[in-house]
Amino acid sequence: MKSLSFLNHEFEAFPSPELALTDPNGLLAIGGDLRPERLLSAYYNGIFPWFNSDDPILWWSPDPRAVFIPGEIHISTSLRKYLKKQPWRITINHAFTDVMAGCAQPREKQSGTWITQEIQMAYRELHYTGHAHSIEVWEGERLIGGLYGLAIGQVFCGESMFHRKTNASKAAVAALQQHLLKMGFKLIDAQVMNSHLESLGAKAIKRIDFITLLSELRNNPVDPATWTTKEVILELE
């Protein structure tokens, strides 16, 4: 039976994602906190937090799940030509806090953000402990785009992206895909499907299939140097 669980501040195991509600799609639990152990447990089990500043903490595992296969993200010919002409520089884990702040800025036609100060503090802690990572796009010394997410074994869980110049976030996505391919990652979790993700080649798969893939990949080791601070040279041929 589908049911909504209420979490307290004592650390406890999450309920099975299969118990998540269908309306709203994927809502599994309410409450708890954003301590690193709980967040890592959530992502390890295919669950993520998503809530507005005036809501309690809400935990989700939607069905279907939006995913990318590294190597299958669509980078159009016109975008490749555009990016080749840009003097942009792309880095990994150079400005995580600034990327989160950029992602937290309200979007057009939105009055607020789900990336609250509480969320930012929690994910900065995950970054400091080597679990959360960022891709930055620079024009000179100005940060013009980027994305961030978590690495769980050979799975990258994308959280959010932003841009201050046209196509800068797409440059970050292209760099992420290139890097993950080189480092042997097998899956990118994009959480909830939308038209933008679909245009980039995201696939909607059943939650049970996502959980199966996650369980196969989450404990696989990756090169310790994967997330050292570095520059990425886009290969756009």
Swiss-Prot record:
From the UniProt record, list the reaction(s) this protein catalyses: N-terminal L-lysyl-[protein] + L-leucyl-tRNA(Leu) = N-terminal L-leucyl-L-lysyl-[protein] + tRNA(Leu) + H(+); N-terminal L-arginyl-[protein] + L-leucyl-tRNA(Leu) = N-terminal L-leucyl-L-arginyl-[protein] + tRNA(Leu) + H(+); L-phenylalanyl-tRNA(Phe) + an N-terminal L-alpha-aminoacyl-[protein] = an N-terminal L-phenylalanyl-L-alpha-aminoacyl-[protein] + tRNA(Phe)
Q: Which InterPro entries match?
A: Acyl_CoA_acyltransferase (IPR016181), Leu/Phe-tRNA_Trfase (IPR004616), Leu/Phe-tRNA_Trfase_C (IPR042203), Leu/Phe-tRNA_Trfase_N (IPR042221)
Entry EC number(s): 2.3.2.6
Whether Transferase counts among this entry's keywords is yes
Write out the annotated subcellular location.
Cytoplasm
One MF term in the entry's GO annotations = leucyl-tRNA--protein transferase activity
Look at the named UniProt entry and state the broad enzyme category this protein falls under.
transferase
This protein's UniProt keywords? Acyltransferase, Cytoplasm, Transferase
Q: What is its main location?
A: cytoplasm
Q: Which domain of life is it from?
A: Bacteria
Name one matching Pfam family. Leu_Phe_trans
Tell me if Cytoplasm is a UniProt keyword of this record. yes
One GO term under biological process is: protein catabolic process
Mind naming one GO cellular-component term on file for this protein?
A: cytoplasm
What role is this protein assigned? Functions in the N-end rule pathway of protein degradation where it conjugates Leu, Phe and, less efficiently, Met from aminoacyl-tRNAs to the N-termini of proteins containing an N-terminal arginine or lysine.
Instruction: Please state which protein family the record places this protein in.
Output: Belongs to the L/F-transferase family.
Protein name, UniProt field:
Leucyl/phenylalanyl-tRNA--protein transferase
* Species annotation: Shewanella baltica (strain OS223)
